[in-house]
């Protein structure tokens, strides 16, 4: 067996390994965003940043699927099969909606809580100093703005 192949697979960008037809995912984003009354551009921006639309993405910390849900969060919001595109988007969108309520629609806090967990962000509000959280919030915000002001584009692949 060639030893370089497993190494290549480990180092190859994960979003290149499992590209699928985006149409169902886009449809589910629109459907669940409308159902939970949250911006589809926000949900799509989170997917852009979290998994780059790879439904089989797994983070180093164990987050799974398009919206990179941690196992407990996935179960809490109804995704018992976190790699199932519809379940992942439904649960992730429901989680975003809960965060929107908790943080009174402040997208900065919603993005920070999505990334770092809602408990710490609820305590710190905008006083968080973790550079990873700050960078994540700025990246999600940028993707959201790109999508919001370019609504004619499909939900997938808005990366400039």
Regions found by a protein language model. Give the residues of each.
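Positively charged n-region of N-terminal signal peptides that target proteins for export
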Residues: 1-3
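Cleavable N-terminal signal peptides
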Residues: 5-6, 16
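Catalytic glycan-binding domains that act on GlcNAc-containing polysaccharides
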Residues: 17-160
């Amino acid at each position: 067996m060639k030893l370089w192949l497993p190494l290549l697979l480990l180092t190859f960008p994960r979003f290149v390994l499992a590209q699928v037809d985006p149409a169902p995912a886009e449809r589910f984003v629109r459907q669940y965003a409308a159902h939970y009354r949250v911006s589809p551009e926000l949900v799509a921006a989170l997917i852009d940043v979290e998994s780059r639309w790879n439904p089989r993405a797994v983070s180093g910390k164990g987050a799974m699927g398009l919206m990179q849900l941690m196992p407990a969060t996935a179960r809490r919001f109804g995704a018992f099969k976190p790699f199932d595109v519809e379940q992942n988007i439904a649960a992730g969108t429901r989680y975003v909606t809960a965060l929107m309520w908790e943080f009174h629609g402040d997208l900065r806090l919603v993005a920070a809580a999505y990334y770092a967990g809602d408990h710490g962000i609820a305590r710190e509000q905008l006083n968080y100093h973790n550079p990873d959280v700050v960078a994540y919030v700025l990246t999600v915000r940028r993707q959201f703005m790109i999508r919001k002001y370019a609504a004619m584009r499909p939900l997938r692949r808005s990366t400039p």
